[in-house]
């Protein structure tokens, strides 16, 4: 598994390329803007683009989708869906709160968290479709996942789930909230 990233657009959104180099396939995650740069990253990987995956529908994560879709097909996915990317399995976890339809994508020991989870913070819930209670449930769902994960957020620097469990007040509150609601775990 290889992860490449570039920051795109005026809000500096992280766009990721998840690759299985052995199989020669890749998935593009949150192509927020600057389609030529994004497509160049795909071309430089030498891998065949198999998926374009969006963590949510806000413009800063989707602006480059239209020009990229002119070259690649689209597919919709839902909570619990698994996508095969070479030898990798990507699992979709619905994580509403920042927006309706927000998801996190889990591949091996990696979580692509979009605007659900940031280093020491979480995504805003004051936009249309945002809901603080849903955000706490989503953060609790992530925090209660068994194991250790590297977290690649939609903005700012990567982190680890272990670190966020210890220091992120939103994850800590979400884990209590999620557990109290009787929905602990994935």
PLM features: what roles do these ranges have?
Residues 12, 23-26, 33-91, 166-174:
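Active-site HxH/HxHxD metal-binding segment of metal-dependent hydrolases
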Residues 4-7, 19, 78, 84, ...:
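Residue-level detector of conserved, well-ordered beta-strand and adjacent loop positions
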Residues 89, 94, 99-186:
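Metallo-beta-lactamase
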Residues 5, 17, 82-84, 89, ...:
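Residue-level detector of beta-strand face positions
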Residues 1-45, 104-114:
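Conserved beta-strand hairpin/beta-sheet module of binuclear metal-dependent hydrolase folds
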């Amino acid at each position: 598994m290889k992860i490449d990233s570039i920051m795109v657009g005026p809000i500096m959104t992280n766009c990721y390329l998840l690759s299985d180099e052995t199989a020669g396939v890749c998935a593009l995650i949150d192509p927020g803007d600057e389609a030529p740069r994004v497509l160049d990253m795909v071309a430089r990987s030498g891998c065949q683009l198999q998926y374009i995956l969006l963590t949510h529908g806000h413009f800063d994560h989707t602006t480059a989708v239209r020009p990229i879709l002119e070259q690649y097909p689209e597919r919709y996915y839902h909570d619990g869906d698994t996508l095969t990317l070479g030898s990798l399995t990507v699992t979709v976890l619905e994580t509403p709160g920042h927006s309706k339809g927000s998801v996190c994508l889990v591949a091996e020991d990696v979580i692509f968290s979009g605007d659900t989870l940031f280093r020491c913070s979480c995504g805003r819930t004051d936009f249309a479709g945002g809901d603080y209670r849903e955000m706490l449930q989503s953060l609790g769902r992530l925090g209660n996942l068994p194991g250790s994960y590297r977290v690649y957020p939609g903005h700012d620097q990567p982190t680890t789930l272990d670190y966020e469990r210890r220091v992120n007040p939103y994850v800590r509150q979400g884990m209590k909230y999620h557990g109290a609601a009787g929905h602990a775990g994935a």
